[in-house]
A protein has these predicted regions:
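Gram-negative and organellar
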Residues: 1-234
Length: 234
């Protein structure tokens, strides 16, 4: 079992009619039962965004993060910085977001770097259904990877089948999700493929595929039931 608590804010400060300053901050506390991998992290982001048209923006972004473990005898604290360009476009039925850059990690005198790429395409198939493709690669850790999986497949009360480690790893991933929003019924289906290459303990390296499904039925304004299922192989 695991618990991840986030407090986040992302104000946008206009500098001119088409240019804005992006400032963000997040504090996160991750707790993992039966392990010593729990940690707290403080993240700050700074970006300069330019509106290219009524429906598109281009921004230059920098992120700095400090991760401190509950038990420093298990793993050393580390710093992580990322820089990337992001292009975002909102169409009549299609939304597109592309990030491209890199990440540098400083861990007790050692420096590791890796590419940062993220593509998200969201297509409104009908008035009530959407299809979302997400693919990319990033230098990440257990808490961030779990957060991403929950965003893709929804909240899994069992936590799925995650690897919990204090080690960082390069994650390559692709997912496809379909969502149907009815008047009283919501259906979410997702498939996810990923490859993880760990920096220190290579025994954790894995290639995995998974699928999730969630059906929610609202019986009244205050009462609903939910059916959830998941499958994974590695």
């Amino acid at each position: 079992d695991f618990v991840i608590i986030d407090f986040e804010g992302e104000p946008r400060l206009p500098l001119s009619e088409r240019t804005s300053l992006l400032v963000g901050g997040r504090w996160s506390d991750a707790y993992f039962e039966d392990t010593e991998a729990g940690n707290q992290r403080l993240t700050g982001t700074l970006g300069l965004e330019r509106r290219m048209s009524e429906r598109s923006t281009l921004s230059l972004n920098a992120t700095a993060e400090r991760v401190e473990f509950d038990d420093e005898s298990v793993s050393s604290n580390y710093d992580r910085q990322s820089g990337y360009l992001e292009y975002a476009m909102q169409g009549a039925r299609t939304n597109l977001s592309v990030r491209a850059g890199g990440t540098v990690l400083h861990d007790y005198g050692d420096t590791t770097n890796g590419p940062l790429l993220n593509l998200t395409v969201e297509r409104q198939v009908t008035a009530r259904s959407t299809l979302t493709l997400n693919a990319g690669t990033e230098l990440t850790d257990s808490a961030d990877a779990l957060r991403r999986e929950q965003q893709i497949g929804g909240i899994d009360l069992d936590g799925g089948n995650p690897i919990v480690s204090t080690d960082q790893f390069q994650s390559d991933f692709v997912s496809l999700a379909w969502a149907l929003e009815g008047a009283r019924t919501t259906l979410d289906l997702a498939v996810d493929l990923r490859s993880e290459d760990y920096e220190r303990d290579t025994t954790f390296n894995r290639d995995a595929i998974g699928a999730t499904g969630s059906l929610v039925r609202r019986l009244s304004a205050r009462l609903s039931w939910r059916l959830y299922g998941g499958w994974s192989k590695q």
